[in-house]
Regions:
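Bacterial N-terminal signal peptides
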Residues: 43-56
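Cationic, low-complexity basic patches in intrinsically disordered or flexible, solvent-exposed regions
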Residues: 3, 10
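Beta-propeller domains
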Residues: 406, 415-502, 519
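Structural preference for beta-rich elements and adjacent junctions enriched in aromatics
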Residues: 59-437, 445-446, 456
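Exposed, low-structure sequence patches enriched in small/polar residues
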Residues: 381, 472, 476-479, 483-776
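Extended, hydrophobic alpha-helical segments in both membrane/secreted and soluble proteins
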Residues: 278, 297-303, 311, 317, ...
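Short hydrophobic alpha-helical segments enriched in small aliphatic residues
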Residues: 5, 15-17
Length: 776
């Protein structure tokens, strides 16, 4: 599996191939391998794609299953036991194995029941297990990593559009994960809704109760039939998935076109649709050697108003992000900026509405909210803002307008960005996204982003995109085709101000192929977006063949194999080569035990047009470079209390050699109350321009009294900055929607001028934040 710079969202919701695949792979040519195999590979790749398209006869889809939510006439005590008479009288349905052997019986019988009142939906699960003591639990954190946990998941299509919806998941301890669905292959886990869950152990497994208040959801008023799918994941024994609707290897849980039908939702009420969330924050800050400790108290709030049952507006005043987790540090050995994900809840909620094109990933993000309120790591306060998210008929709408405050930034920011002053003026920043569902397969849309986070230039981006997708290609296969174009205007560099691209994606279990091309003009500069390589044309073609050996054969100990190829080529808009990479995974297997190992061959070509510093004091000179790197990787199964993984990159690096060693060790107590994880990266380079060693160490620890009261700590140190940082956070969810946060951030700097290389304190911040939700 080709590494992805982004941290994956670890939620066990797919079959093995779907869960493990970060990028589809498909070789085309290997440029300077040097072009001798390019025509043959191109012909084979395009031939395979044409063969897939040519055989796209559509078969009749199987009838979607249906169930009726039983009307609730009594109260439910949320304890996970399902002992009220209402549960006994409710209609039930069971789940079918989806992977690894679709349709085959399993001992993990799962019964599901649905109750509906006027203001909430209740889901009840009875999860039978022949070995109840082996049920896996590793996390109690909200939106934590549940990839190695036994879980149950729910997806709801509350609009009946077969595209957008909600995702809810709990593990056997009742820890919650939720998100918004806007793509049948992916989900945004950034949304945090107000809902609750409890679990209980039973003699033959475990049971769970989930309650989702109607005011948490947006839905079409009076719509009696919703889309529903339910899934259970068993982590041990090589991992097993059970599903209600479309239990096939090529189906994604998030694909709402494959969901079943939930009847009886027409009487659900939303109330007045008003939600008030005031918050108060107290902060104590000290910069050692610069300023004495300061104290600051502030207050603010959010007001949410559902203009219609499907369209929500949010007004925010004096927005505060005191509870936000710190970034995980990265080592950058490239000449391009690194990507750090957005973590602030105000911007995360509804962020999926701004998804543009298909498969652009970190290559190009037209609107990247992290550019708002953050300038080279320095915080820029927000005075006020307004958001609009939702639907109106077949229209999908998103709007964001934020006013920042004039701020004095640290001298380091001035130097890094080349600012004329340390005073950054307040400015207005705006983004808007509108899309239209032409039919069940085709969506067209537009996007606008306006403003400059530095408040120095005029900048506007405008773009259009179209995405066509089906889950019925060649009967039951997935096929996606997309295209986009955008332009920027204002104070931008000279040259072509246009960007464009297209993608064809065939993401399925046995064969997964894609072709992707995007071009960004020299004058294409979205200041509110993320574009690490402007002035380039980027082509990516890949294919993966992913067989599942017969359990009765000589390779029955292998769950699935992944034979991957991917070729990436980057040129300037005129076609002059800048870089290429050919990634091959001749060995990549997941075992029946859940363990996996992989070996890769990864030749590169780089044209360096300007010298760049790869490490302090080590400059890569101008020139053409061809080098080959190799990777060996092994990981133990995520269901075990003790997990270990190691990755080693080795081989040539420009005109020298580089070995990169990454390891992680993770331990969880039997009930998931204590979790400790150690991550390390050690890079050893031998270059004509100079040798260097870079190290990054990270320790994460968590103690959970229960899923609503959790203490976490994140410790990081890297040798480039010589800085040790800690982030300690206590989160107490008094009840869903009402939270108390206590955060302590502290930094130490290693002084190389001292003989003992001792660490001295640099920064200290303590923050307490209380937020409360009132619903009307």
């Amino acid at each position: 599996m080709k590494p992805n710079a982004a941290s994956p969202q670890l939620v066990a919701t797919h079959a093995d191939a779907q869960a493990d695949r970060s990028t589809m792979c498909f070789p085309l040519e290997t440029a300077s391998l040097t072009g001798r195999v390019s025509l043959a590979l191109r012909a084979r790749s395009l031939g395979l794609l044409l063969l897939i398209l040519a055989n796209g006869a559509t078969a009749i889809a199987p009838q979607a299953p249906s169930t009726t939510a039983t009307r609730l006439s009594m109260s439910i005590t949320l304890d996970g036991k399902l002992d009220e008479p209402a549960w006994r009288d409710a209609q039930s349905f069971t789940l079918t194995q989806q992977a690894p052997s679709p349709g085959q019986p399993t001992p993990y019988v799962t019964e599901v029941r649905v109750l509906v009142g006027t203001d909430a939906i209740y889901f009840g699960f009875k999860c039978h297990d022949p070995r109840p003591s082996s049920v896996a639990i590793h996390s109690m954190r909200r939106d934590g990593d549940q990839s190695g946990d036994d879980t149950v998941s729910i997806v709801l299509d509350t609009y009946g559009d077969h595209r957008t919806g909600y995702f809810f998941q709990i593990n056997a301890a009742g820890a919650r994960v939720d998100g918004l669905i806007d793509d049948p292959q992916n989900i945004s886990l950034d949304w945090d809704g107000i809902w609750d869950a409890r679990t209980a152990k039973t003699e033959d497994g475990w049971s769970a109760e989930i309650v989702i208040p109607s005011r948490t959801l947006s839905f079409a008023r009076g719509l009696d039939q919703w889309g529903l799918n339910v899934q259970r994941f068993i982590a041990r024994g090589g991992r097993t998935w059970l599903r209600w609707s479309s239990p096939t290897l090529d189906s994604f849980l998030y694909d709402l076109s494959r969901a079943g039908v939930l009847v009886g939702m027409g009487a659900l009420e939303q109330g007045k649709g008003i939600e008030l969330i005031p918050y108060a924050t107290g902060k104590s800050t000290r910069f050692y050697g610069v300023s004495p400790r300061s104290w600051l108290a502030s207050e603010g709030g959010d007001l949410t108003w559902k203009i219609t049952p499907q369209l929500v507006s949010v007004f925010t005043v004096n927005t505060d992000f005191a509870e936000t987790e710190v970034d995980a540090r990265q080592i950058n050995l490239t000449r391009f900026p690194l990507f750090f994900p957005e973590k602030r809840s105000f911007f995360l909620e509804g962020a999926n509405q701004y998804t543009f094109g298909l498969g652009l990933g970190q290559q190009f993000i037209p609107f990247f909210s992290r550019n708002i309120g953050l300038l080279d790591g320095a915080q820029i306060p927000l005075d006020a803002g307004v958001k609009l998210n939702g639907r109106a008929g077949k229209w999908n709408l998103a709007f964001l307008d934020v006013q920042t405050r004039e701020t004095v930034v640290p001298l380091q920011v001035v130097q890094d960005l080349g600012l004329a002053s340390n005073v950054v003026p307040g400015t207005n920043l705006l983004a808007s996204r509108v899309s239209y569902d032409v039919n069940d397969n085709l969506r067209i849309g537009s996007i606008v982003a306006h403003g400059d986070p530095e408040a120095l230039r005029q900048n506007t981006l405008g773009g259009f995109d179209a995405v066509w997708r089906t889950s019925k290609f060649r009967g039951d296969k997935n096929l996606l085709i997309a295209g986009w174009t955008a332009t920027t205007q204002g104070d931008v560099p000279p040259g072509d101000k246009l960007g464009w691209g297209f993608r064809v994606d065939y993401p399925n279990d046995l064969v997964a192929c894609q072709i992707n091309m995007n071009q960004y003009g020299n004058g294409f500069q979205p200041l509110l977006g993320f574009l690490p390589r402007p002035g380039t044309r980027q082509t990516d073609v890949g294919c993966a063949y992913q067989p599942r050996p017969s359990k009765d054969g000589p390779f029955g100990w292998i769950r699935q194999e992944f034979f991957e190829n991917e070729y990436t080529r980057v040129t300037d808009p005129r076609g002059i080569l800048e870089s290429w990479e050919y990634f091959m995974a001749p060995v990549n297997v997941r075992l029946e035990s859940g363990d996996r190992f992989e070996f890769n061959w990864d030749p590169h070509g780089e044209t360096v047009l300007a010298p760049f510093e790869v490490a302090p004091g080590v400059i890569i000179p101008v020139g053409d470079y061809t080098f080959t790197r190799w990777r060996a990787e092994a990981q133990t199964s995520g269901h075990r209390p003790l997990q270990f993984g190691t990755t080693t990159w080795f081989g040539q690096f420009y005109n020298g050699h580089l070995t990169q060693q990454e390891n992680y060790l993770k331990w969880t107590s039997p009930k998931g109350k204590i979790q400790i994880e150690l991550n390390t990266e050690n890079d050893f380079a031998h270059m004509p321009e100079g040798n260097f060693v870079q190290r990054l160490w990270q320790v994460q620890a968590a103690y959970a009294w229960n899923p609503n009261l959790i203490l976490t700590s994140f410790i990081q140190y890297d040798t480039e900055s010589q800085n040790l940082g800690t982030n300690t956070r206590l989160r107490w969810t008094i009840k869903p929607g009402n939270d108390l946060f206590v955060v302590w951030n502290r930094g130490w700097q290693r002084l190389l001028t001292r003989p003992d290389l001792s660490l001295v304190p640099q920064t200290d911040l303590v923050a307490v934040k209380l937020r409360w939700t009132f619903r009307f």
